Amino acid sequence: MVDFQLNNFSFDPVVSLGFAAFLFLLMALPISFWAVAGSSDSSKARFLVAISNLFLTSQLILRWWQSGHFPISNLYESLCFLTWGCTLAQLFLERAWRSPIVSAVATPVSLLSIGFASFVLPENLQSSAPLVPALRSSWLVMHVSVIMCSYAALLIGSILSFGVFLVDGKKQFNIRNSSFGSGSFRQSSELYLDERNENLNSIQPIEFTNAEQLDSLSYRSITAGFLLLTVGLISGAVWANEAWGSWWSWDPKETWALICWLVYAAYLHTRITRGWQGKKPAILAIAGFFVIIVCYIGVNLLGVGLHSYGWFFDA
């Protein structure tokens, strides 16, 4: 870790960049809520999130240069990488649907993640350290980075599913297409064929509700996250076999990662084969959100198993 001294005050530039990212997300949060209420322009919040993502990118690059290895070797680095992934996913989703609702429901996830890393973790966990021999492998980037990106996509998708309840309250709605179709990015200017008229010229515009848009974006985000999680689990099994001679050891992190995979597999199964849409699959997505929290934060902080980054027992 590189520290700069100024009048007997030392600071780590990596941690400082994390603070800067937190501040920009903190400014973006109320603007997002005001934009939902119609009192502000959501593009301002989007700009602040983009600036935060740039700070996080710079932070990860600087830590990589300092440590000599990809910056996902401890809890602090992985939280910063997770925040980077969440902000990037949010920007992509907002590009697909320019609505303040996306920013209002997604920004808190990134803010809590970088806030926890910057203000809750002790200094010894914020510092870089040499990799243990088992982690000195090219699989580190392949496995851990893919897993963290999957967590980012799944967390954002789950929060968007929760937004379905916030937007529609107790109302019931049905997505006006199939589970495959509802997963597509839909814009309000899309066209649909009036089935009551056999004339192919009878094409009319249809306005999709906020709940339908949220459901659509959530479905896509969770699908991407599930695919990444699958790749991450497979690469982790291959790496484990090379490092420890076992494909699967039922380590607490492995077990909870499998539970996470099963929950989101059930989500996709109910949408694709059972035709569930709207609030029913959203319940599974929200359950998956809490499973990720236990898998990632809970196991790590308890310092249990080979995958934990430790805190209470190691600090």
Curated annotation (Swiss-Prot):
It is a multi-pass membrane protein. InterPro entries: Cyt_c_assembly, Cyt_c_biogenesis_CcmC, Cyt_c_biogenesis_CcsA, Cyt_c_biogenesis_CcsA/CcmC. GO terms for molecular function: heme binding; heme transmembrane transporter activity. Disulfide bonds: none annotated. It is found in: Cellular thylakoid membrane. The chain crosses the membrane at residues 17-37, 72-92, 101-121, 146-166, 221-241, 255-272, 282-302. Keywords: Cytochrome c-type biogenesis, Membrane, Thylakoid, Transmembrane, Transmembrane helix. Required during biogenesis of c-type cytochromes (cytochrome c6 and cytochrome f) at the step of heme attachment. May interact with ccs1. NCBIfam families: cytochr_II_ccsB (TIGR03144). This is Cytochrome c biogenesis protein CcsA.
